[in-house]
């Protein structure tokens, strides 16, 4: 069973780190694997202020050079690839990695990329419809059965892939707006925002919206993994309002415990070096687990 599907507090690496060489990315993934982190993820952008790699290609490469750590897109810009193509790639990656893949999906938040690369520009409503249709197509194709959907954004007509997915591949949505949060609660296996973008109070309100939508859809809210990206700068002082967790070991522990208290059970820690992952694993994360557990027990 995936370490990410329960209520145990887990930690990941990678995520919003960019500008790394292939060798640095490999070191980071292998270091996270060896240090006991549970997930390594990569973002998805055609263009960025710093160099980035295609996540599917890179995660496939990393799957062959890691042992146990799960691998995720964080998050895949859905409009860049047709859902049937995503379904086939995701099934292959999950199979070749031994069932270690998590598909993080987003509607595509950077409209400038759509315009620059000649992609179809979609309204917010069209992105939500597209995500709903894509999830239906993905899960239908992964079942191995012929799948038909005449959608507004995406359509398939008796399509199937072979082999089918060996398991239900988890789908996490990088959701922020009311409609996206409602869709997450209704259909997704996980919710993946960035805490630095929304803050503690915003994250608390959004999580409530996700869980309320899950209940309304007849789902168990506890079945939804609540994960978040966290940029960490240990030993540094980030500017106020930057959304970066920073400071001394004690200060970083306190800030991470506050994030867990919102209801997050997976913290994806964005640091650029294995040395920083090692310091966090040794000096910070055991204390975060202990203090978070104590806070839960006393509440």
Describe these PLM feature segments:
Residues 1-65, 169, 270-274:
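N-terminal beta1-alpha1-beta2 module of alpha/beta enzyme domains
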Residues 52-74, 130-137, 141, 208-217, ...:
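Alpha-helix-loop-beta-strand connector modules within alpha/beta enzyme cores
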Residues 9-15, 40-42, 70-74, 101-105, ...:
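Hydrophobic faces of well-ordered beta-strands that scaffold small-molecule active sites
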Residues 20-32, 86-89, 173-186, 244-259:
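Short, acidic/polar
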Residues 11-23, 76-84, 165-176, 236-251, ...:
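Active-site mouth loops of central-metabolism enzymes
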Residues 37, 98, 188-189, 264-265:
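A structural motif
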Residues 2-7, 82-187, 201-224, 235-238, ...:
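Internal, glycine-rich beta/alpha segment that forms the wall or movable "lid"
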Residues 25-30, 56-60, 87-91, 132-139, ...:
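Generic structural signal for well-ordered alpha-helices
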